[in-house]
């Protein structure tokens, strides 16, 4: 039987599954739409599609390293309860192992890449959604490489609510690298050093501080000096090397790193759900939405 566009459209409307999944299911069932629906349900595709419009803002981060390669990833679920589920934890580890080995460059490339079991990452996640019963997404990941004379530092806070992977060059001291990662988790700097702050951002802050000083009635001849002092505090807030080290506030991070003749190559910090707008459902509306299903 010929698979028409109308038939594919009808199956999409009934299941919410993607066009190619619908076309494939119809082909396999010789155009029988009821059997195609059952097939999509069996594969978990219809179930996953129905959850696609939900918001997944909970979840966990995870970090794995192997030799000179490291990966940090964030996988989201709808609830914190599911994030603690054994099936979710297994999925998180499987994805981390795969990303570490495959080293895809983008989320799209990651989704399309084949895992050891022969399924793509996207299919593997879809299968997990069918078993676990919540929307799950691989939100982001970073694959980082280092030289032999360098150290990875990884730190997970609150069981993975915040994850940081840092790289220190010029040293193989993993304990120091972990301390730097812990500092980044706690303080959340925007930059490694002040030379990474754009001139535009620095000038904007300088202008704000100048206006504040003038409004405080400070004499113009000392405003410039005051502004530079306050600008240094601004850099201390946003630049890792200028910050007081969390384990010893009497020292700056740059002093701690320099003592080992090391430098900070990079760091990646993920906090679960940051930047995702969580939907606030009213309880009555939630009940009605369940009744209507």
UniProtKB/Swiss-Prot annotation:
GO terms for molecular function: translation elongation factor activity. It holds the Pfam family EF_TS. Keywords: Cytoplasm, Elongation factor, Protein biosynthesis. One of its GO terms (cellular component) is cytoplasm. Its main location: cytoplasm. InterPro entries: EF-Ts_dimer_sf, Transl_elong_EFTs/EF1B, Transl_elong_EFTs/EF1B_dimer, Transl_elong_Ts_CS, UBA-like_sf. PROSITE patterns: EF_TS_1 (PS01126), EF_TS_2 (PS01127). It is found in: Cytoplasm. Residues 79-82 are annotated as: Involved in Mg(2+) ion dislocation from EF-Tu. Belongs to the EF-Ts family. NCBIfam families: tsf (TIGR00116). Associates with the EF-Tu.GDP complex and induces the exchange of GDP to GTP. It remains bound to the aminoacyl-tRNA.EF-Tu.GTP complex up to the GTP hydrolysis stage on the ribosome. This is Elongation factor Ts.
């Amino acid at each position: 039987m010929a698979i028409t566009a109308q038939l594919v459209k009808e199956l999409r409307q009934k299941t919410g599954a993607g066009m190619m999944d619908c076309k494939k299911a119809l082909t396999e069932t010789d155009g029988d739409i009821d059997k195609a629906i059952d097939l999509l349900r069996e594969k978990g595709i219809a179930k996953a599609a129905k959850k696609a419009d939900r918001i997944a803002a909970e979840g966990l981060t995870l970090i794995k390293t192997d030799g000179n390669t490291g990966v940090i990833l964030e996988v989201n679920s709808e609830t914190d309860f599911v994030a603690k589920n054994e099936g979710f934890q297994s999925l998180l580890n499987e994805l981390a192992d795969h990303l570490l080995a495959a080293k895809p460059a983008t989320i799209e490339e990651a989704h399309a890449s084949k895992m050891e079991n022969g399924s793509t990452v996207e299919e593997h996640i879809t299968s997990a959604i069918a078993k676990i019963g919540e929307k799950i997404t691989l939100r982001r990941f970073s694959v980082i490489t280092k030289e032999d004379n360098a150290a990875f530092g990884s730190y997970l806070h609150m069981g993975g609510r915040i994850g940081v992977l840092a790289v220190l060059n010029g040293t193989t001291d993993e304990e120091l690298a972990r301390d730097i990662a812990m500092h980044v988790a706690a303080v959340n700097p925007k930059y490694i050093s002040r030379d990474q702050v754009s001139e535009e951002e620095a000038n904007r802050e300088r202008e704000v501080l100048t206006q504040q000083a003038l409004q405080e009635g400070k004499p113009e001849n000392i405003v410039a000096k005051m502004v530079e002092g306050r600008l240094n505090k601004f850099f201390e807030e946003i630049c890792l090397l200028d910050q007081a080290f969390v384990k010893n506030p009497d020292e700056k991070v740059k002093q701690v790193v320099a003592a080992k003749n090391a430098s900070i190559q990079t760091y990646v910090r993920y906090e679960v759900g940051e930047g995702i707008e969580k939907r606030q459902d009213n309880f009555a509306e939630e009940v009605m939405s369940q009744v209507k299903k």
